[in-house]
Amino acid sequence: MKKVGYFFYTFVPLLAVEAIQTIALFFMMGMGMFGQGFVGKLAFPSANVSDRLEKTFTSVNFNMMIMIIYALITIAIFGMWYYARYEGNFLPSPKKTFNPMMLVAIVILVPGTQFAANFIANLTGYIRPDWLQQYNKLFETSGITDTTFVTVLYSVILAPICEELIFRDVTMRCARKALPFALANLMQAALFGLFHLNWIQGIYAFALGIVLGYVCERGGSIYYSMGLHLLFNLWGTLSGFFPDPGNSVVVFVVVIVVTIVSLVVGFVLFNKGRRKLPINSTGI
């Protein structure tokens, strides 16, 4: 009976995150209405309040502030949740948790996971062009596509920490109390995909979530999945500055080969390094 309870409890973190996002949204809307409606009216009596509010609510900075506030609140809540409820250890013993071979493996996995995610996104977009249009529109309005200090802060640092605490920490630990690792990993990855609220990103996030869950569980530390997630997002953020290789057959073959080699070598090194760690050590 307890396992059934834990199974349904696994959905609570996702619901809590949605609530936090709503709170952050209403907080920023309230601040915007106060700033533009009350203070703005005093400073600029002739200004049209509704136009100023519309401009504020649709601005990139406004959207980014919502995400940053949400991320900071989520990191605090889920960090305490995991520490208190699941005895999380955020200061693990380096000798018992980290192995140089595993750290190198995380870096090697980055191009493979990025290329695989892009392939999944492109294939999904080819099958459903309407999903691709929605995905592109979402990114354009969110401001994530603009490479600024704020977007890098959120995308590369805050988002990976936030999402790993939600899904590979709290959600995974809860699911593990009801299911074997393989099913628990699929469940947290599915919730991770659902969290993104669009088909394109949700499908490749599901695949990425499986890899992150495996790395976290087998590595015995949330820092492995955080590191991979951070580097994955960093690659995506900086990819706009990479030269365009074109769409030739040669480029396609090279990308496929790099993807396969990256994933195979990365996982082999990771598991080889894991076997060198003390038995049953954990730094999650």
Q: Model segments located where?
A:
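Membrane-interface capping segments at transmembrane-helix boundaries
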Residues: 83-89, 267-282
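Membrane-interface segments at the starts/ends of alpha-helical transmembrane spans
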Residues: 7-10, 45-66, 140-145, 244-251
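Functionally important transmembrane alpha-helices
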Residues: 18-27, 189, 200-256
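Alpha-helical transmembrane segments
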Residues: 6-21, 104-113
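Function-critical hydrophobic alpha-helical transmembrane segments in multi-pass membrane proteins
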Residues: 112-117, 137-199
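Juxtamembrane helix-loop-helix connectors linking adjacent transmembrane helices
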Residues: 42, 55-57, 88-159, 280-284
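Alpha-helical transmembrane segments in multi-pass membrane proteins
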Residues: 18-85
